[in-house]
Structure formats: structure tokens, C-alpha cells
């Protein structure tokens, strides 16, 4: 199974074997660094004049002159841009079409239209239901944990690709989507109404002994607000220690991470990004507020990206112990830049680390 890149974007989305691609399809199907700069076509025009692109121009001319029917120039360009980025062989870099980019932005904000399930992508490219939200459209339609989504409106999900499948299942609130599922060898058809749903990415409770427990499933645009409400309530209720559960948290936005770390760490620079020319940039900093409670972070092999930086920051600043299994080991950062077509490029641009530690990319956070 593949893991959602939930590439830590700048705003902080897989290397070895890409872990389970997880998303909140709400279906609960990821910045601060989304750079809204429309320079893509200008870059292409400059490159197109270079000799190394001569064969590509020849190929395009041959196709235009000899293909047996009309060529859809827009579709060809979209495919070419996807292929160009795919040639980097980087699972975190991708080109998104306009529709895919809109779905991406909605998901990263923590607000989406969907059916109320959490899914993972199988090796075959289908979507397996990991959790069905209570009182969600999916639950009302009879969907169950373990169901495999294979088709949407008659189209094969594996052929649509991950982003295409999410986009097809989502849609306008109040409309109905037809899904084909596999359950214990049987094929079922379900009609599910799409609804507006807010993704819950932070939740918590008080455990025995006045231990505050906070589960963070990802770092979305709405995560800091959810986290702060839980954190404040636990502290006000007299928590004597805090546990942060980041198991299976694939990461998310650095802007969300920074806001969550702010009340926990001392004032100053917390994490930096290092670019290929050796220059550095402050990624995370904190003000003078600092949590004095004992803290513990729980992690596993699917704890990645922003979730790893959260863990490393608390550990390296001596604020928390870490328990569980070694983490995934993703210490590289992506930025997402909009393109003139309405699509977007997500590109790996830097490594990152805490100011008190070393970059752990591919080296894991060991327990």
C-alpha cells in the first residue's frame, strides 16, 4: 500500500517503499508556502529553445502532423507536464491539473465535500475503507470498514489514479455519487449523498491520573484551532502531563505545525530549511510562551514529515520523550506553485531539521 505524500509542504504531503497513501476523503478522505506565482509557461518557453529539447519539439511536430485524428493540445500538454515531473523519480513532486489542485487545496484546508470515510490506497490502486464516520453519508448508505472502493460512476478507480479518484468521488454538496465496492468477495453498488464535512485532525481526552491525551492525525489548515481548543481544555482541567499521539500521521502544512508547537516550546528559532545552494531559511519559530508539563510523543513507522518535525522539535529541545517504533524518515520539504493553466506544481526544494539536531531524511527518528 502507498502512503499519501502529505509531503511536508512549505507550508510543509514514501521513499524507500512509499507507506500507505492516506487521506481524509470526507469522503474524511497534504504552504504557508503555496506560492501563487504564474511563471510556468514562461519557463517552458525558455526551455523549449534549448537544444536538449529539440527531440521533444520534433516528437510534438510528428504527432501533430501524423496522428490519425485531431490532437487535444490541452490534454497532451497536461500529460507532458505530468511526465516531466514524473521524470524526477521523486514521489513527493507532482504536477496537478486544475481539478486536482482544487481538490488538494480543499483537503489541505481541512474542509471538504465528501462521503465521510477514511481510506488507504491499495497496491492495485483501489481505495480501502479504514474508518466510517458516525452519522456520515457513507454510514447511512451502508458502507463498512474494510470495503474496497473499485469504481465511481462506473469508472475504474485504479485507472483514474489517486487524485483523480478523490476528485471524482468528491463533488458538489447535495449531489449523489454511485460507488462500486467489494466486500467479502461480493460486489455491491451504493448511492451516497455528498455533504460538506470538516475534517477532524486533532482530538483528545483526559486519561486516568490527569494525563492529557491529544491525537493529531495530520497537520491541516484547521488543525491548530482544533488542537488549541483541546490543549486549553486539558490544561484548564488540571492535566499533570501530556501525551501526543502521532502514529500514522503522514504530515501536512508547516504553517499548521508552527502554530501547534508555539505554546509548547521556548522562544526562538525551532527549525530551518536548507536549499541546494546551501542557504537556509527559518521554518518554525516560537514566542515566549512555553509548556512546563511533562510531555511524551507516540510514533510509528507511518509518522512522517511534519509529524516527524513535531516529534524531533519536542525531543531536541528537551521537552518530551518519544516512544513507539522508528519513524518513516522524511526530512525534505515541498512547495506548491500555481500555474497559468490553473494547475499547480508541487516540487521538493529543501531538506529540513531542528536547530538543535541533524536532518533525519532517510535516517529515521529512532526510539
Give the ranges of each region predicted by the language model:
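Gram-positive cell-envelope targeting signals
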Residues: 1-57
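Cleft-lining beta-strand/loop regions that shape enzyme active-site pockets
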Residues: 14, 43-48, 130, 139-141, ...
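PDZ/PDZ-like domain segments forming the peptide/carboxylate-binding groove
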Residues: 29, 66, 110-151, 155-159, ...
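Acidic/histidine-rich, surface-exposed loop or edge segments in extracytoplasmic proteins
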Residues: 58-66
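Extended, small/polar residue-biased N-terminal targeting/export presequences
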Residues: 67-128, 176-178, 184-191
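Conserved small/polar residues in nucleotide/adenosyl-binding loops
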Residues: 365-367
Amino acid at each position: 500500500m502507498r502512503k499519501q505524500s502529505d509531503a511536508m509542504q512549505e507550508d510543509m504531503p514514501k521513499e524507500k517503499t512509499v507507506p500507505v497513501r492516506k487521506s481524509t476523503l470526507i469522503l474524511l478522505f497534504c504552504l504557508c508556502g503555496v506560492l501563487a506565482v504564474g511563471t510556468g509557461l514562461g519557463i517552458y518557453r525558455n526551455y523549449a529553445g534549448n537544444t536538449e529539447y529539440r527531440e521533444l519539439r520534433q516528437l510534438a511536430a510528428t504527432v501533430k502532423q501524423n496522428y490519425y485524428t485531431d490532437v487535444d493540445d490541452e490534454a497532451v500538454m497536461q500529460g507532458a507536464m505530468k511526465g516531466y515531473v514524473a521524470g524526477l523519480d521523486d514521489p513527493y513532486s507532482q504536477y496537478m491539473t486544475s481539478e486536482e489542485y482544487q481538490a488538494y487545496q480543499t483537503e489541505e484546508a481541512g474542509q471538504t465535500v465528501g462521503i465521510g470515510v477514511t481510506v488507504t490506497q491499495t497496491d492495485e490502486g483501489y481505495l480501502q475503507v479504514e474508518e466510517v464516520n458516525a452519522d456520515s453519508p457513507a454510514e447511512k448508505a451502508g458502507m463498512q470498514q474494510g470495503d474496497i472502493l473499485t469504481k465511481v460512476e462506473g469508472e475504474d478507480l485504479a485507472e483514474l489514479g489517486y487524485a483523480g479518484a478523490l476528485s471524482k468521488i468528491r463533488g458538489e454538496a447535495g449531489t449523489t455519487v454511485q460507488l462500486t465496492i467489494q466486500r467479502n468477495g461480493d460486489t455491491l453498488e451504493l448511492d451516497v449523498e455528498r455533504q460538506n464535512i470538516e475534517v477532524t485532525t486533532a482530538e483528545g481526552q483526559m486519561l486516568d491520573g490527569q494525563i492529557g491525551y491529544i491525537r493529531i492525525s495530520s497537520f491541516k489548515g484547521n488543525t491548530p484551532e482544533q488542537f488549541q481548543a483541546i490543549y486549553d481544555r486539558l490544561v484548564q482541567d488540571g492535566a499533570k502531563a501530556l501525551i501526543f499521539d502521532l502514529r500514522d500521521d503522514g504530515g501536512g502544512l508547516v504553517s499548521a505545525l508552527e502554530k501547534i508547537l508555539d505554546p509548547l516550546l521556548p522562544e526562538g528559532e525551532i527549525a530551518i530549511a536548507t536549499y541546494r545552494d546551501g542557504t537556509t531559511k527559518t521554518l518554525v519559530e516560537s514566542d515566549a510562551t512555553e509548556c512546563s508539563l511533562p510531555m511524551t510523543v507516540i510514533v510509528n513507522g507511518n509518522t512522517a514529515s511534519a509529524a516527524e518535525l513535531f516529534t524531533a522539535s519536542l525531543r531536541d529541545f528537551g521537552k518530551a520523550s518519544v516512544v513507539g517504533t522508528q519513524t518513516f524518515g522524511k526530512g525534505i520539504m515541498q512547495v506548491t506553485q500555481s500555474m497559468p493553466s490553473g494547475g499547480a506544481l508541487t516540487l521538493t526544494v529543501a531538506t529540513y531539521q531542528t536547530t538543535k539536531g541533524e536532518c533525519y531524511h532517510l535516517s529515521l527518528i529512532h526510539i
